[in-house]
Amino acid sequence: MIHVIATITALPGSRDAVLELFSKNRPAVLAENGCISYEAVIDVPDFGAIQTPLGTDTFAVIERWESAEALKAHGASTHMAEYGRTTKPLLASRVINVLEAC
């Protein structure tokens, strides 16, 4: 199983717009062969000293895929190309970590 943690920082004030585009694209991703889960997450407010907040402009996408091949097909899909095209002008940065269990 492949896990992905994508940390996405929107331009100031643009996070909600990016999350709306994410939500519109999510059903197509969940329908892909090999997609186990695909979810956007934000900070839990006021959680305390244990938390390192992402911040008001940042969210993470937590993904699980059956295989590396399924993840590669996801990256090559037309709906992800469109999602990337529409969100790119709204983003300050993104960091993608592709992981496997040890």
Residue ranges of model-derived segments:
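Absolute protein N-terminus
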Residues: 1-2, 102
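Short amphipathic alpha-helical segments
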Residues: 14-40, 79-87
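Generic structural motif
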Residues: 11-13, 68, 101
